[in-house]
């Protein structure tokens, strides 16, 4: 890693865990406020909330498109509108028929897709259960693998923090919770645990000085994460230029999550493990 080294002796455990824990607490408060206000911690996309999705190819500006649909419940997202992807609130009967006629009158080649509210809520429930089930299974595997309480809790807490903080940033950046972004969060559970398990395994099951084991784990772990991050950034750029919103949103969530994971692994998890070792844990 050249001159970029990881000095575990530079900070005390309390200093290492302070920033990740503050961000985690703020994220929990933010998501809880959203849940009380809207019923969901992150704004649901059309997959979960229901609505009308329209894909069209046009040279019209964002302002022109917004003006044309001023009488309809268009959810404004300039990046999506500029890419020719429009989302409207759920409409029934004559309202949906009027919208369809209004769209085809100006954009005859547009693709129109409607998701029902009831089916969307069913998918929403299934996605939440999938996230919970995946996280619980991950926690069980970690506890079975290490069989030591504090290090296992550190890994699980780090992964939990990754998901919660990433979800908060999703809402800040206007990324909705959809089937695609839910899949990204599921992938993030696996990505985040990799470096945590590497660090914990190196520290608990290898011989040598503690600071050397930390540095060795850091060199390997940071290479793993940055190479994955580089690939995901390229994916984000390519599919943003290609206006493929689903893959763009998946890669955006992964970029946020991987950056958060580096903080949680090498500050939160490492800080807890350092405290555990200083207290005499092996």
From Swiss-Prot:
One of its GO terms (biological process) is protein targeting. GO terms for cellular component: plasma membrane. It is found in: Cell membrane. It comes from the Archaea. InterPro entries: SecD/SecF_arch_bac, SecD_SecF_C, SecF_arc. Pfam families: SecD_SecF_C (PF02355). It is a multi-pass membrane protein. The chain crosses the membrane at residues 16-36, 126-146, 148-168, 169-189, 221-241, 253-273. Gene3D superfamilies: Multidrug efflux transporter AcrB transmembrane domain. Belongs to the SecD/SecF family. SecF subfamily. Involved in protein export. Part of the protein translocation apparatus. Forms a complex with SecD. NCBIfam families: PRK08578.1-2 (NF006354). This is Protein-export membrane protein SecF. It comes from Methanolacinia petrolearia (strain DSM 11571 / OCM 486 / SEBR 4847) (Methanoplanus petrolearius).
């Amino acid at each position: 890693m050249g001159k970029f080294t990881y000095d575990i002796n530079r900070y005390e455990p309390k200093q290492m865990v302070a920033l990740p824990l503050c961000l985690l607490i703020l994220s929990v408060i933010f998501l809880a406020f959203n849940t009380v206000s809207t019923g969901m911690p992150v704004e649901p996309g059309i997959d979960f909330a229901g609505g009308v999705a329209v894909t069209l190819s046009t040279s019209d500006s964002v302002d022109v498109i917004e003006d044309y649909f001023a009488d309809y419940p268009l959810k404004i997202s300039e990046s999506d509108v500029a890419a020719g992807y429009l989302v409207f609130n759920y409409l029934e009967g004559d309202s949906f028929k009027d919208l369809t006629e209004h769209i085809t009158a100006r954009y005859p080649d547009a693709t129109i897709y409607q998701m029902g509210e009831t089916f969307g809520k069913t998918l929403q429930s299934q996605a939440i259960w999938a996230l919970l089930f995946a996280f619980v299974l991950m926690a069980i595997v970690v506890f079975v693998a290490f069989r030591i309480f504090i290090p296992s809790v550190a890994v699980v807490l780090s992964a939990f923090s990754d998901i919660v903080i990433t979800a908060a940033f999703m809402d800040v950046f206007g990324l909705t919770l959809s089937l695609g972004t839910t899949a990204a969060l599921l992938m993030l559970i696996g990505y985040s645990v990799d470096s945590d398990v590497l660090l914990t395994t190196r520290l608990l099951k290898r011989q040598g000085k503690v600071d050397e084991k930390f540095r060795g784990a850091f060199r390997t772990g940071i290479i793993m994460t940055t190479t994955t991050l580089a690939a995901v950034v390229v994916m984000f750029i390519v599919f943003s230029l290609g206006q493929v919103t689903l893959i763009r949103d998946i890669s955006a969530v992964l970029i946020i999550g991987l950056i958060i994971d580096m903080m949680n692994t090498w500050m939160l998890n490492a800080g807890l493990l350092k405290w555990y070792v200083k207290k005499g844990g092996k």
